[in-house]
């Protein structure tokens, strides 16, 4: 009986998707893979199905007894995953944004696969990592939540340049304060960090100019970041309970210089300390639409530098930003 239910659920989840020969949606595309599988999604049915997923177990290595979900792959096949709900936000913050749902899972067909997926007001997003390479599923563009692309990361055509740099004036100071016997993760213990994630008014404007829109964009990005950090460093970041207080929607009154990453380092440190409270977060960061990527080295949990990190891109969405 259990096996029959297992197969039925997996088969039903395939029916949320319908392959299409073309996508009848106009508008600018920020994600432009050279090759992709075009799909139509019944988002409402998928949401209803995902809402039945169980919470992630305390032992994150045991992800084999979750909701069975079949996911469309770029080559025309479907792969099965065992899915659980998990929180990328503190429960108090998640209660303020019930439309944002994040999920994690493990591959069934391919046991090397892991998946992170989310559903927000901007649709469905998924990132699959395996020994065969990375696969993404994203809306065709910002004008639709019903048409999607399933594509391999290696086929992604970069639309925007991105520069990442290091603010190194404190690197030597930090290096001198870190013990040579720091314990490194062995991959079996998942370490959680409290994240204070701010944004500029310009970033929020990209997501409709609302706190809920900006939070949705942040959730998609951080879900994918966690997908990488969990598998490679056994680290997870969760947004703090009052994170909404540092999501700014007015570029004229926010505390940030949107196009200057170096300047925003100290601005974000001050903002996170004053609004969130230094003792209430482990790492801080700010999203913008300019300023590139810049951060201090080894600053996590360092009280004077732990919020000095910036990520900015004119189109803060998709793999180029996430």
Q: Which residue ranges define each predicted feature?
A:
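Generic hydrophobic, helix-prone segments enriched in Leu/Val/Ile
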Residues: 46-53, 83, 117, 149-150, ...
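Short, hydrophobic/proline-enriched secondary-structure or compact coil segments at domain edges
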Residues: 124-129, 282-287, 308-313
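N-terminal prosegments of processed precursors
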Residues: 5-142, 263
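Sec-dependent N-terminal signal peptides
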Residues: 1-3
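Short pre-active-site segment immediately N-terminal to the catalytic Zn-binding motif
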Residues: 214, 310-322
